[in-house]
Every structure is written in C-alpha cells, then in structure tokens.
Amino acid sequence: MTTAENREGYKRVMLKLGGEMFGGGKVGIDPDVVQNVARQIAEVSKSGVEVAVVIGGGNFFRGAELQQRGLDRSRSDYMGMLGTVMNCLALQDFLEQEGVDCRVQTAIQMTQVAEPYLPLRASRHLEKGRVVIFGAGMGMPYFSTDTTAAQRALEIGCEVLLMAKAVDGVYSDDPRTNPEAELFHEITPREVIEKGLKVADATAFSLCMDNKMPILVFNLLTDGNIARAVAGERIGTLVDGNVSTR
C-alpha cells in the first residue's frame, strides 16, 4: 500500500513535459527554462534512475486550435508533431551540455536528426544510463502527447508517469480562481472520475488506469522537484489504485 507519509522511489520513470513550459509562456523556446529542466533531469539520471521523456509541442502548434482556425485537423496535428521534435532536440542539446548521454527517438522517421521509435532499443539506452526523449507524438493525428507518454511508459516498462505541470498537483477546483481549492496528495483513479478531476486527457488516463500505471502530478517550476518525485518524497498528487489515504 502507498500511504501519504511514504512512497517508494522509482528506478525507471516517464517524464511528461508540456511544450508551453519550454516557451516560457511565449511562442518558441526559452533557453533558460530548457536549461533548468535539463539540469533537473541530469541530476536524476546521474543518480542512477532511468529517465524517459515525452514533450508536447504547444509552444509551437496545437492541432485542435489550428483546426478551429480552418486548417485540416490531421495536417494540423502533424505540424504539432514537428513542433515536439524541435523541443526534443533543444532538450537533448542542454542535457549533453550537462554531461548526460541522450537519444531522441521519433514516431515519424527523420533519421538525420533522430532514431526511429524502437521500444527495445529505447530500453537498452535506458539500461546504459542514457536519457531517451520521444518526439513526434504517436506519429498519428488525433492522439495527444499525454497519450503518447502513457503508451510509451507502458511499452518500455516504466514504473510511474510523472506529469510535470505549473501547479502543485491535482486540486478539487482551479486554485488560481478558488483559494479554498483542496490539494489531493493521494487519490485513486476511481475518485478522479467520480469527482470530475482533470489529470490527463481521457485516453491517457484510461490507459494508465486500465494497466495500473501510477500517475504523479507535480510542479515543475519548483527547482529540484523532479528528483523529489523520483525519490518518493511526498510532493504533488499521486493517482494510484493502491493508495490507502489522501
């Protein structure tokens, strides 16, 4: 049983990063933000934890939003996938500056800049201490990068899906508009559904729930939180069918 006072640390994790964070709230890439994220990931990787990463592309394109402006949804989603690859390459560069060996694998083949997505090869990279960054989403339209993170985490045998956000975890209401909103420290997937809470998109959440993959939602903007999350410190919100309290 996982309790509010004690969580076990993890050896292989999937880190989901939103693309908007890479832009610092603007279009494009904010080098200071990416460098800070790279330093946090490097600290965790050098401690012996195997780290895989999926990054969104919202700082460049969002397929659903482009569709609302009249673009074909499939083509819009492919544009978003290319945006994720730009984020992946930026993170790879900053990780290498931190002395961390890193590989980018993409669901759309672009062999001059990245390996194709091969789960067995990705696992071998992780075993050798390399960080693996997955780009181009699922390689198909209509699938979010949340869903990509959940699917990749399951396929390469991660122990937890770490959802990095700009808030401290999952709240009963929007904490930006309701100062009385309650932060859940531990909660079951069933409670998430019953309370109508937002953790990840529906497909990603269903994948994790059906396959008993824990999700830890935490604040990336607090320096050192990736290491704390991996070590099992009581931060953020743990969504797990085995939690005993919250």
Swiss-Prot record:
Mechanisms controlling activity: Inhibited by UTP.
Binding site for ATP: 16-19, 58, 62, 171, 174
EC number per UniProt: 2.7.4.22
InterPro entries (alphabetical): AceGlu_kinase-like_sf, Asp/Glu/Uridylate_kinase, Uridylate_kinase, Uridylate_kinase_bac
Residues where UMP binds: 57, 77, 138-145
Primary gene name: pyrH
HAMAP family registered for this protein in UniProt: PyrH_B
Major localization class: cytoplasm
SUPFAM superfamilies: Carbamate kinase-like (SSF53633)
GO biological process, one term: 'de novo' CTP biosynthetic process
Entry protein name: Uridylate kinase
Family affiliation: Belongs to the UMP kinase family.
Keyword Cytoplasm appears in the UniProt entry: yes
Biological pathway: Pyrimidine metabolism; CTP biosynthesis via de novo pathway; UDP from UMP (UMPK route): step 1/1
One Pfam family hit: AA_kinase
Keywords assigned by UniProt, alphabetized: ATP-binding, Cytoplasm, Kinase, Nucleotide-binding, Pyrimidine biosynthesis, Transferase
UniProt function note: Catalyzes the reversible phosphorylation of UMP to UDP.
Superkingdom classification of source: Bacteria
This protein's GO CC annotations: cytoplasm
Catalytic function, reaction form: UMP + ATP = UDP + ADP
